[in-house]
Amino acid sequence: MDTPNKDDSIIRFSVSLQQNLLDELDNRIIKNGYSSRSELVRDMIREKLVEDNWAEDNPNDESKIAVLVVIYDHHQRELNQRMIDIQHASGTHVLCTTHIHMDEHNCLETIILQGNSFEIQRLQLEIGGLRGVKFAKLTKASSFEHNE
């Protein structure tokens, strides 16, 4: 029989907040469809852990994962090739790309990246700075261990 691992258990703790902050928390729960305050707080903690993980400046840490979403004018001359060249030249691993034709003028591309935070963010800035790129947003992720 397996004995429960301390890390697998849910720990209950209390938090003291001002009323206006609690009201904001409750409004966010309703707005985002959370089932409880605990669910929202867990998500907020996870988000902060990812943010802190990305802030750690370790050039040898290649474990960062991100998705770069790019919207661009596909009529812009040689833009697609320049985006590909930047990806190939970067120190970041491009794990996957997906290309979608949004309309007659615009394409959306998602680029899944793995590497260190500096190289990933540099790639975002390089692609985002190209003429014809209308939007370039990086969503950062991290693979820290946690239980649902």
Swiss-Prot record:
This is Putative nickel-responsive regulator. Binds 1 nickel ion per subunit. It comes from Helicobacter pylori (strain G27). It comes from the Bacteria. Gene3D superfamilies: ACT-like. Chain A, domain 2, Met repressor-like. Ni(2+) binds at residues 88, 99, 101, 107. GO terms for molecular function: DNA-binding transcription repressor activity; nickel cation binding; transcription cis-regulatory region binding. GO terms for biological process: negative regulation of DNA-templated transcription; response to nickel cation. Transcriptional regulator. InterPro entries: Acetolactate_synth/TF_NikR_C, ACT-like_dom_sf, Arc_rbn_hlx_hlx, CopG, CopG/NikR_regulator, Ni_resp_reg_NikR, Ribbon_hlx_hlx, TF_NikR_Ni-bd_C. HAMAP family: NikR. Its cofactor is Ni(2+). Pfam families: NikR_C (PF08753), RHH_1 (PF01402). Keywords: DNA-binding, Metal-binding, Nickel, Transcription, Transcription regulation. Belongs to the transcriptional regulatory CopG/NikR family.
